[in-house]
Amino acid sequence: MKYLAATVEMADAIYNILHTTIRAVYPKYYPKEVTDFFCRHHSREHILEGIASGNMGVLTDRELIIGTGCYDGNHITGVYVLPDYQKQGCGSKIMDCLETEISKKYDTVLLDASLSAVCFYEHRGYKTVGHGIYKLQNDVKLVYEIMKKKLAAI
């Protein structure tokens, strides 16, 4: 597996990873409105902005793009792995790469964790430092954990 900087040519594959993963995983934890919100949020425009920032990468298995990660400053803004590749170390590989990049400028990292990912981040040493609630249509609420980790100096 290799973690590479994302390019514009990879945007469709990244879009597929995000939407496939959201549609497969999030309904187990959230109502339909939250799943729909995440799919709208992860639009092609949003993906192209992440690529343009230089802070978005992809995880490949041979030639297949199977995961993606992105950060802004010391905030990890997204980690997604195709469902067929989950629980195989792919998310950890992406996190290792993101944390390494962030540790070049910061000693702590923050992220907003969906309910489906909290245990994964806890196993990586993240601690919940707050709770977020984002109000959606039909009085539905998106609930998430605000998590933080102290990074080792490189």
Feature roles, as predicted:
Residues 1-16:
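A short beta-loop-alpha structural element at the N-terminal edge
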Residues 19-45:
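Conserved GNAT-fold acetyl-CoA-binding loop/helix
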Residues 53-67:
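Conserved beta-hairpin
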Residues 72-84, 112:
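Conserved acetyl-CoA binding element of GNAT-fold acetyltransferases
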Residues 84-85, 89-97:
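Conserved acetyl-CoA pyrophosphate-binding loop and the N-cap/start of the following alpha-helix
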Residues 107, 111-118, 134-154:
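C-terminal "cap" of GNAT-fold acetyltransferases
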Residues 121, 126:
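Conserved active-site tyrosine of GNAT-family acetyltransferases
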